[in-house]
Amino acid sequence: MRTTVSISDELLATAKRRARERGQSLGAVIEDALRRELAAARTGGARPTVPVFDAGTGPRPGIDLTSNTVLSEVLDEGLELNSRK
């Protein structure tokens, strides 16, 4: 399908250079970039890591799970989150 888009001269030159380096057409490079952009938007980027409490022990007493500030401080200080059996 043919369409017309407006892009900066600098971006077009960079895309043409990339196409030459890869031995691809300019259209293929633009299509690949657009596919990656749309796929990234669908997935929402990297998922944050969340602490996992093993064997159902739960968090250590005294850690307020409703406070972002407390959780951030505990994680920044590298303290143990799991309670011990």
Curated annotation (Swiss-Prot):
For the keyword Transmembrane helix, the answer is no
Which keywords fit this entry according to its UniProt record? Answer: Toxin-antitoxin system
Q: Where is this region: Disordered?
A: 45-65
- Lineage, top-rank taxon, reads Bacteria
List cystine links: none
On whether Transferase is a keyword of this UniProt record, the answer is no
Q: InterPro entries in the record, alphabetically?
A: CopG, Ribbon_hlx_hlx
| GO BP, sorted A to Z | regulation of DNA-templated transcription
One Pfam family, please name it. Answer: RHH_1
Q: What does this protein do?
A: Antitoxin component of a type II toxin-antitoxin (TA) system. Upon expression in M.smegmatis neutralizes the effect of cognate toxin VapC25.
Q: What is this protein called?
A: Antitoxin VapB25
